[in-house]
């Protein structure tokens, strides 16, 4: 018994068109600060911070730090009972860094995973700030920016993290997610200690970010 042969392509036999990846729409600034950045009047985040201006557009960060990378750190499901039954939402955590002294972390929640990630991505970009790199290890004392300049401590929820200077070539002595955040910030060598509920990604990420921002507030 012969079987009908399937024809390649779609239902009408025509070849399927390959979907091209969507190109990101060009940034059109909406704020006065964004317009100045887009016009080239402001060329660094330091200028914005010194002026005490508030960044409200992620496009500003992308324009000033074109080498910035964003990575999804964690995606989870939030379920709770409501009067209409069980409600399900997604929670995403995204990190943004250029592996050379800048890091930001954001969180987003939505009914769709994609939208939750987009919200977290945008928030991570808006939270990007400078990290002071250096060599604070008494075992090394070189002049390269491969570690932190001194011991720093940060807290997020129940999680407390310390980052200590390490000699060049040691690497990052840290757990997987903490290590990746340090890499995105630009650290190559460091000791770390962590206390509390470190599997809680949101608290751990906040603790790491606060830790690294101490490099400026203490310096």
Curated annotation (Swiss-Prot):
UniProtKB keywords: Ribonucleoprotein, Ribosomal protein, RNA-binding, rRNA-binding
Gene Ontology biological-process entries: translation
Any Pfam family matching the protein: Ribosomal_S5
This protein's record includes keyword rRNA processing: no
GO molecular function: rRNA binding; structural constituent of ribosome
Segments of this protein annotated with the region Disordered: 1-32
SUPFAM superfamilies: dsRNA-binding domain-like, Ribosomal protein S5 domain 2-like
Top-level taxon of origin: Archaea
GO cellular component: cytosolic small ribosomal subunit
PROSITE patterns reported for this sequence: RIBOSOMAL_S5, S5_DSRBD
InterPro entries on file: Ribosomal_Su5_D2-typ_SF (IPR020568), Ribosomal_uS5 (IPR000851), Ribosomal_uS5_arc (IPR047866), Ribosomal_uS5_C (IPR005324), Ribosomal_uS5_euk/arc (IPR005711), Ribosomal_uS5_N (IPR013810), Ribosomal_uS5_N_CS (IPR018192), Ribsml_uS5_D2-typ_fold_subgr (IPR014721)
Residue span(s) of domain S5 DRBM: 68-131
Protein family according to the UniProt entry: Belongs to the universal ribosomal protein uS5 family.
Free-text note regarding domains: The N-terminal domain interacts with the head of the 30S subunit; the C-terminal domain interacts with the body and contacts protein S4. The interaction surface between S4 and S5 is involved in control of translational fidelity.
Subunit structure: Part of the 30S ribosomal subunit. Contacts protein S4.
Function: With S4 and S12 plays an important role in translational accuracy.
Protein name per Swiss-Prot or TrEMBL: Small ribosomal subunit protein uS5
Organism: Cenarchaeum symbiosum (strain A)
Gene: rps5
